């Protein structure tokens, strides 16, 4: 199996039928949110485009992005790693180690200059000349710059590479730095999350291989196809938010009924991600469905934004559960206040008019 083979050629060699291949393309189009009309375009790309070499680097991180990636169901990670791409370097997954691993990295960079994708998990620390993270006897930041020099594009996996994450939380003693602040001359796509959703990760790769370009990005560099909506927008608990039905404390009656978690710190209203639509573990669940509020892990600096259990802000709404007496009482108080204010303004105007009249009619003294 070589990088010059196409995905379809690899699939055929593995005994996959044409029908199964087209089914795969259809599922991929659906997973990317493109619809069935793009099935033929994806099939054509898989049949004609050679497998792209990918180098996957690891800096300061916990490897949760890799753990998420290997659990992708649409497409299956085995299809991505063994057929769609040529994963030439990943020190977590590859069999080679030491000098052999470093030789594989150098060989791919030399043979495919300008034609490989660099995926980065984790970030480089810059304090002490980068000595807080050593790969192959050298600072990781040096390996990053070396691999990025001839890369076609860079994918920043997870919040570590995209924003800095916990390593960059105050006071950030190692000066952990997001990839885009170190590499400034390459197209970079950010896929934040701690970790990102598996199907989001494989979906980004599939899109880039199919269309030969980065997906449309938002102003922060994230793919709009997965980060254009707040979790709150599609959350199944949203009707409870609109109704004013909230969990006041964990394990109260509202929690048992599945009410909105906003008051116990859910960051869904300010977090852009696909958790409430794609979900996790092959679409099984996501944190809010499990009873815990969103912590906003795909947003920049979420570690430094206060407690995960502090509400974002107070809200003032009746909610459809408010009864007529409550609403009527509130309206009556408001009306009474308005009448009092009107009376006060009228009294001031009368007093001002009286003073002006008195000044006008007073006779002048003779000198």
UniProtKB/Swiss-Prot annotation:
UniProt function note: This enzyme recycles the H(2) produced by nitrogenase to increase the production of ATP and to protect nitrogenase against inhibition or damage by O(2) under carbon- or phosphate-limited conditions.
Protein family: Belongs to the [NiFe]/[NiFeSe] hydrogenase small subunit family.
Designated name of the protein: Uptake hydrogenase small subunit
Entry comment on modification after translation: Predicted to be exported by the Tat system. The position of the signal peptide cleavage has been experimentally proven.
Signal peptide start-end: 1-45
Gene3D superfamilies, A to Z: Cytochrome-c3 hydrogenase, C-terminal domain (4.10.480.10), NADH:ubiquinone oxidoreductase-like, 20kDa subunit (3.40.50.700)
Complexes and interactors: Heterodimer of a large and a small subunit.
Main localization (coarse): membrane
Localisation per UniProt entry: Cell membrane
Catalysed reactions listed for this entry: H2 + A = AH2
One BP term from GO: anaerobic respiration
EC number assigned by the record: 1.12.99.6
Binding locations of [4Fe-4S] cluster 2: 232, 235, 260, 266
A GO CC term assigned to this protein in UniProt: ferredoxin hydrogenase complex
Residues binding [4Fe-4S] cluster 1: 62, 65, 160, 194
Keyword terms, alphabetized: 3Fe-4S, 4Fe-4S, Cell membrane, Iron, Iron-sulfur, Membrane, Metal-binding, Oxidoreductase, Plasmid, Signal
Pfam families: NiFe_hyd_SSU_C, Oxidored_q6
A GO molecular function held by the record: hydrogenase (acceptor) activity
Broad EC category: oxidoreductase
Cofactor note: Binds 2 [4Fe-4S] clusters.
Cofactor: [4Fe-4S] cluster; [3Fe-4S] cluster
Membrane topology: Peripheral membrane protein
Residues involved in [3Fe-4S] cluster binding: 275, 294, 297
